[in-house]
C-alpha cells in the first residue's frame, strides 16, 4: 500500500517490487492520495508486463477516512509531513501492516512539520484539518518515537538521512 501517491514516482518502485517478487501470494498494490493522481500508465503496465498481473486498486480520499480491513505486507507513507498526521496514520495502519512501515521525508521534516518548511498558514490548516496547531508545527520524529515507545512489536529497522530521509519500521512479532 502506498499513501501519498502524488506524481506516482514511488508507485513505480512498489509495482516493480511486486512484479519481481517470487512470492506465490496474489500481488496487490493499493494506492491512495487525497487528490486524484494520474496512474493510467502504471495501470496499463501492471496489466501488460506482469504475469499474472499485479492487481492495482486506488482511492483518492483522505487516508484517515479509508475503510480497509485486509492487511498489507508493507505500507509506504508520504503524505502530509506533520506530527499530527503521521501519529494518526501509524495508529490506523500499523494494525493492518504485516511487515514494514516505510516513511519518506523523515529527515527534512523530522523536528518541524512541513508547514513551517513550506511557509503554509498553520492556523488555516488547523481549522481545515481539525488538528491542533502544535500537531501541525511539530515534525515526524516525535510521532515515530512515540509510536515505537508504545508499540514494542515494532522496531526501527533503518533510518536513511539522505534524499530528505527514509525511515523503515519492522514488525517483529510475527
Where do the protein language model's features map onto the residues?
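S-adenosylmethionine/decaboxylated-SAM
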Residues: 1-174
Amino acid at each position: 500500500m502506498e499513501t501519498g501517491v502524488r506524481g506516482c514516482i514511488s508507485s513505480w518502485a512498489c509495482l516493480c517490487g511486486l512484479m519481481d517478487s517470487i512470492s506465490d501470494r496474489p500481488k496487490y498494490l493499493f494506492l491512495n492520495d487525497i487528490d486524484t493522481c494520474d496512474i493510467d500508465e502504471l495501470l496499463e503496465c501492471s496489466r501488460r508486463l506482469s504475469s499474472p498481473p499485479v492487481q492495482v486498486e486506488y482511492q483518492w480520499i483522505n487516508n484517515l477516512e479509508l475503510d480497509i480491513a485486509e492487511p498489507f505486507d508493507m505500507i509506504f507513507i508520504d503524505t502530509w509531513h506533520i506530527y499530527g498526521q503521521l501519529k494518526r496514520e501509524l495508529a490506523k495502519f500499523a494494525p493492518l501492516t504485516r511487515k514494514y512501515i516505510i516513511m519518506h521525508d523523515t529527515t527534512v521534516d523530522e523536528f518541524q512539520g512541513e508547514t513551517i518548511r513550506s511557509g503554509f498558514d498553520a492556523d488555516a490548516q488547523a481549522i481545515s484539518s481539525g488538528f491542533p496547531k502544535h500537531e501541525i508545527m511539530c515534525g515526524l520524529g516525535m510521532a515515530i518515537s512515540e509510536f515505537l515507545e508504545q508499540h514494542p512489536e515494532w522496531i526501527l529497522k533503518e533510518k536513511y538521512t539522505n534524499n530528505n530521509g527514509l525511515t523503515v519500521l519492522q514488525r517483529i512479532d510475527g
